[in-house]
Structure formats: structure tokens, C-alpha cells
């Protein structure tokens, strides 16, 4: 995580490598903004020759070149404004795209524990809202600082050029203005951090409402969800109003200081020693320049709020980039594992938990064996699977595949050896065929996909659909029943043809008839494969070569079905209970 005193300069230094590839566009836009501000300054400077000499009949040259100068300056102002807007939009668009890509890529390689600790809504807010804040804030800040800053410098220079005595008063007010901006900016940053954190909460509440809309309706939770959303949205409104109040207060301070300065200059210019040195054109240029300074000064005070939004968003994004990705230092690569698995003295505690989920686990599974993991919910069955897939890393002990430590395998190669059908299936908003062949669409033929679907008994319902395998199934397969979704997931695992098969309550959502069919298909593919089956139903467990009974993170019984029945222990009691049912 970033430190609280992470300076603006350090944030910019981290952001610059993302911006630097597009510095040519940035330079063009900066030059265009300076030209734009210079054009405004030169327009004001035309007042002096116009007032001093433009209305004298003897000076006809001014009436000739003055209109031409105005047209030229307006064309310069318009074209430079277009160029700056185009290139700033181009640069900011590229920057936000690259930040999103980098963030998405970084999140894709984060450990599972990262997602366990954060809501989907908060992470969505980082990718969408925060990245957009960086780009929009940066572009608006750049436009304001360069254009208005150049205008202020130009006006200062012009005022000092015409009368340094009157303009020297501005030297006094400049430090006061910047001190005021600095004080208010600290408050802006605190408020913006609260707003951005609560934007994630808004996304989280909306996400829960969309996903749990049926539960909300059936349990009558509409009012509770509305109240939660109203509270968070009102909090964001209150914080936004605090920014408006702070910004408006600063605006009042700047205007008050400017009015005092104008009054002082007006008084000084009326002194006999000064008024003799000034012409009507000079006084008009200085006063007009002073009034013209109000707009850029006001813009610079307002830009601070946008700047702080961008800085807070950058801090939030960089805090994610600073979290370490999955450890993947292994170099071992195999085409196809034999499937021999060994857990040696494994102890594991989930992040944020006090008690270990697994305690001193020792398991040896021969290649091609089917091992059933049974036990009550929370006993540690799924944790064993999570450690084998390296979704989590053991606190103590080692896990081996074919007598090689899992950490020595490249992660992608290790996971290519494992097909997983979890109780929490996720299907993508795509066709059935693309879901079955997920991430391997170019490798498998239509015939292979159909074969896997037939083996999983999924073709029974697929052929009844109008578009068959090309049917779009909706987000997470919402257009399918629970059993149909489960069979698609099983077909996906069958197609992978991996040496290790993990079935985590794979048939839990199926009716008896479908379960029998799928179980037959699973029995076929388990041959010559190492299979880990997590199940509660004895009918699924009985055929396993070995049964491991897990309770409170420990293996309390192991053996095949007949051996455990003869022991008359906990497994035998579970068996009798299910028979009675």
C-alpha cells in the first residue's frame, strides 16, 4: 500500500511512464495552449495604440493594420484552441486506455485472496471511475494550468512593461493567493478520497441488487436496499457540497484580494507623480489586464479540486498496482503429468482468519486413483483443492505433483494439468460451444465439442434449442437451469482431457436421472486420471479408490468404502444416516 505521505511529485513520477509515449501530442497541445493565451494577451495590448493614437486623424496607419491584427489574432486563437483540444483528448484517451489495460492485466494475475477481500463493485469502480478520473482530471488540469498560467504570465509581463510601478503591487498578492490555494487543496484531497471510496460502495450495492433481485423480492428487502443506496448516495452528495463550499470560499478570497489590489492601483495611479507618466492607453491596458486576471486566477483556484480528484484516483490505482501478483517463479514444464499427488505436513490459514483451515495434512494419491473428500461444510475439503491448484499457498509444508514441488512448476503449466468443476460454476455471456471450449476455441473442433457435450449428457437439451451449440446463454448462464449449467461445466472439463480431474460437488445441482447419466460419463473419463471428488452423497463416494474424511482441518479417517464401514467410525455413521433417508 502507498504511504499516507505519498507526495504529488512521486505520484506524477509513477504516472509519467504511462503518459510519456504520447509526449509528442502533449507538446503540441501545450504549444497550442500557449499560442492561445498569447493571442488573448496581444488582443488586450492593442488597446494602448488604439486609445493613444487610433482616433487621431494624422495616424491613418493604425486604422489599416489594427483590423488585420484582430482577424489574425482571432484566427490564431481559434485554430490553437482546436489543436489543443484535439491532442489533449487524444492523449487522455490513450492514457486512460493504457491504465485500464494495465490494471486489468494486473488484476488477472492477482492471488485469489485479493478478490476475497474486495467487493466486485469496488474493483469495478477502480477500473471504470478511477481511471476516468485520472484522465479527465489530468486533461482539464493541463488545459487550465498551461493556458491560464500562460495568460497570467503574459498579462503580468505586459503590465510591468507598461508601468512597473503600478504592477509591482501584484508581487505582494501572489504569495497570499498561493497560500490560500495550498490550504484548501489539503481539504480537497481528504474529501475526494471519501467520495471515491464511496463510489465503490455504490457499485457494490447496485451489483448486489442486480444479482440478488429475486431474493430481495421474495424476502421483501426492497426498502432496506433502497435505504442503503440512499444513505451512500446522500453521503457522496454531502461530500461534493463540501468541495463546492471550499472552492467557492477560495473564489471569494481571491476576488477580495484582487479587488483590494485594484483599489490600491487606482489610488496609486491618481498620485501626481504617477499620473504624469501614464497615458489613457496605458491606464486602460493595466486596469483591463487586472480585470482579465480574475478569470485565470479563478480557473486556477477551481482546477485544484479537479487536480485533487486525479491525485486521489492515482493513489488508489497505484495502491492496487503495488499489491504483489501470484508468485510464479517456477520453470518446470511438462506436457502431461502422470498425476501422482502428495501433501506433506500441510498447514494453511485463510488470510484474516485466526484458526487454521488445514492442520498438518499428509496425503499420498497414486496416479490414476480416485479420491473422495467428505466431511461437513467448512471442514477443509475445498481448501485441499485450492492448494493443489495454487489458488492459495500453504503456510507450512509442501505439495508435490509427480515428485516435483508445485512451486517449481510454471503456474500456467500446472493448471493445464487440472480440470475443475466447482460447485460455484461461472459461465460466460457467450455461446454454449465457446463456453465448453473456453480459452481453447482455436484448438478444438466442433466434433470434439459435441463429443464432450454428449459425454456430459448436455446435448439432450442443447439439440432442443433453436441455435444449438451457438445459443447465447446470458451472463453466468442465466438462460439455463442449474442442472444444465452444471452439465456445460462438466463438458468443459471433459474437453480439456487433463490428467487430474477435480469435481467439487459437480453433480449437486442435478436431478437423480441426470446425476446417474453424468456419473456414468465421469466414471469413463476417470480411467487413467487422478480424480479428486468432493461430495456428500454416498452414491458418488462409494466407487472411489480412497475416501478421506475431513473434519476441522484434519483427516480423521481414510480408506476405501468397505474398510471404513468395517471400522464402524464416523464414515459408517454417515453411511447409515443416508441409507435411512
From Swiss-Prot:
Top-level EC class: translocase
UniProt xrefs under InterPro entries: AAA+_ATPase, ABC1_TM_dom, ABC1_TM_sf, ABC_transporter-like_ATP-bd, ABC_transporter-like_CS, ABC_transpr_lipidA, P-loop_NTPase, Type_1_exporter
Catalyzed reactions per annotation: ATP + H2O + lipid A-core oligosaccharideSide 1 = ADP + phosphate + lipid A-core oligosaccharideSide 2
Domain (ABC transporter) ranges: 341-577
Keyword Translocase found: yes
E.C. designation(s): 7.5.2.6
Record's keyword annotation contains Protein biosynthesis: no
Location of the ABC transmembrane type-1 domain: 27-309
Assembly and binders: Homodimer.
Role this protein plays: Involved in lipopolysaccharide (LPS) biosynthesis. Translocates lipid A-core from the inner to the outer leaflet of the inner membrane. Transmembrane domains (TMD) form a pore in the inner membrane and the ATP-binding domain (NBD) is responsible for energy generation.
Name listed for the protein in its UniProt record: ATP-dependent lipid A-core flippase
Organism for this UniProt entry: Wigglesworthia glossinidia brevipalpis
